[in-house]
């Protein structure tokens, strides 16, 4: 991977990490960079992280992998961590490494719902047995997302339209940005997973943008502004998201 592309990927991973509320340390940057430059593998660095942080696989299979531990809001996880703040830090760190791994790969997949589920499944596979699974509970966070009963049918409508739009290839920049904002808003409203929706969707649309002949300068994206734009898009107002993308789509 060329040095300019490596830095673009680092900027993307840093954005995700900081959007989760964490500082992207020099050590974390070096770990991601070593994967992008193919000096280390994600498997090696994840195993090292697990050992250095004294984590142990203590998972006992449950009937509902999408459930939370009793009297907590913490998802069932391979390390049986029940303290949500601790789990979120582990999740963010390991997801960064899997994201770096996926960014080194060429995407031969169709940009469909199965691929979005694959991204989520790989990104969080080291933490959650439920990675890649569609949520079965109602979700709300400043707005109400798609009811779980309708996720599959709504996804079929969204991705069918994306397919008919040729995955946004061959468009001029203005039309591309408008269409990208629309589909980003639709997936945000779909919110198909119990957790990790934003990171999975961002990687999906980042790769789709590159595939369509564009790029995104993540170093210029303000996480709070993007969040507000995403919420507006869920409600059918795409202008804030279009304004954000106008500044960062290359």
Segments predicted by a language model, with ranges:
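FIC/Doc superfamily catalytic core
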Residues: 1-250
């Amino acid at each position: 991977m060329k040095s300019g592309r490596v830095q673009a990927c680092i900027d993307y991973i840093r954005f995700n990490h900081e959007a989760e509320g964490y500082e992207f340390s020099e050590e974390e940057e070096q770990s991601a960079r070593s994967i992008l430059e193919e000096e280390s593998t994600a498997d090696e660095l994840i195993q090292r992280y697990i050992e250095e942080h004294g984590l142990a696989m203590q998972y006992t299979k449950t009937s509902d992998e999408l459930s939370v531990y009793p009297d907590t809001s913490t998802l069932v996880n391979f390390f049986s961590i029940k303290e949500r703040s601790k789990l979120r830090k582990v999740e963010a760190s390991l997801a960064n490494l899997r994201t770096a791994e996926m960014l080194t790969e060429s995407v031969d997949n169709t940009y469909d719902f199965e691929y979005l589920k694959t991204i989520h499944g790989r990104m969080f596979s080291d933490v959650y047995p439920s990675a890649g699974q569609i949520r079965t509970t109602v979700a709300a966070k400043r707005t109400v997302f798609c009811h779980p009963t309708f996720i599959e049918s709504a996804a079929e409508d969204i991705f069918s339209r994306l397919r008919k739009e040729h995955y946004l290839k061959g468009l001029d920049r203005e039309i591309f940005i408008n269409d990208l904002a629309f589909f980003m808003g639709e997936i945000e409203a779909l919110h198909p997973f119990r957790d990790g929706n934003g990171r999975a969707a961002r990687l999906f649309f980042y790769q789709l943008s590159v595939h369509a002949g564009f790029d995104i300068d993540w170093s210029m994206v303000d996480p709070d502004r993007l969040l507000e734009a995403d919420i507006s898009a869920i409600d059918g107002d795409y202008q804030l998201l279009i304004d954000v993308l106008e500044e960062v789509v290359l």
